[in-house]
Amino acid sequence: KEQNIEGSLEDIMTKLYEGISEEELPMALSNIEITSENVENYLGTSDIEFESALASESMVGSIAHSIVLVRAKEGQDIEALKKTIEENINPNKWICVTAENVVVKNKGNLILVIMANELAPKIEENFDKLS
């Protein structure tokens, strides 16, 4: 069974951006706690269960950049949860821009969702290095 990644979602999110310079980061990047009220904005459905989740998005509407960490509940079916996310996320949720790179993957009970452009490979690489 795959090891779960320990630590707060905020700390993990910070690690995902390691090695990316300030200039490369989207403007006005902020972390938003995901709740049952706002989850649809980030994962495309409110019909989803999770322990906790955190999004990192630009507050500028024309920047296609959304990184979401979802921690599954104890004993939850990770593959089913990933499938729900894959079927519902919307890389076109920004009015005039589209995220070209979409990634949904997990390590243990932690799911990473990337909808982004050139930063996607670096963020995914950082996720793969987490332990």
What are these regions (language model features)?
Residues 1-131:
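Soluble, non-membrane globular domain cores that form compact, hydrophobic packing
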